[in-house]
């Protein structure tokens, strides 16, 4: 279940990579990114309940998502806040590893997977400015 979730995140990140950034996404996709950050925070709390506080698996995935999406300062702050809110919400609710926390972990993974899949299926149109006529990018030597 978690492999599918992470594959979805990787797919979303791969499609979002390159010159596009989170600001280039429509509002509904930015909202999905925020929901994904929350799901990652939930998953982080639930995994730590069973694996210990040293486990940083989902936190590292969140950091990678921010790195790939390259959000502006406002959206980056919102992503981090949503991750932390998801973490806090389930950390208090599931402080120990038991059957209930494992079920919640699977549910968070399914939700995150669905969000990542929706994000990975979207395309982003990016406007690029034309390079200067005498630019090296066009194969001509700069004057």
Segments predicted by a language model, with ranges:
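Immediate post-signal-peptide N-terminus of mature secreted/exported proteins
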Residues: 22-53
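Small/flexible residues
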Residues: 5, 32-34, 129-130
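Compact alpha-helical subdomains of small soluble proteins
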Residues: 25, 54-143
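Bacterial N-terminal signal peptides that target proteins for export
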Residues: 1-8
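N-terminal signal peptide c-region/cleavage motif recognized by signal peptidases
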Residues: 17-19
């Amino acid at each position: 279940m978690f492999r599918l979730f992470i594959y979805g995140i990787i797919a979303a990140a791969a499609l979002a990579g390159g010159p596009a950034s989170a600001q280039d996404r429509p509002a509904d996709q930015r909202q999905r990114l925020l929901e994904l950050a929350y799901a990652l925070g939930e998953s982080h709390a639930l995994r730590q309940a069973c694996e210990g506080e040293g486990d940083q698996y989902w936190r590292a995935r969140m950091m990678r998502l921010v790195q790939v999406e390259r959000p502006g300062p406002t959206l980056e702050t919102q992503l981090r806040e949503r991750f932390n809110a998801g973490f806090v919400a389930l950390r208090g609710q599931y402080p120990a590893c038991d059957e209930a926390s494992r079920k919640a972990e699977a549910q968070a993974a399914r939700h995150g997977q669905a969000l990542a899949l929706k994000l990975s299926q979207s395309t982003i149109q990016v406007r690029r400015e034309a390079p200067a006529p005498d630019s090296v990018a066009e194969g001509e030597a700069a004057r």
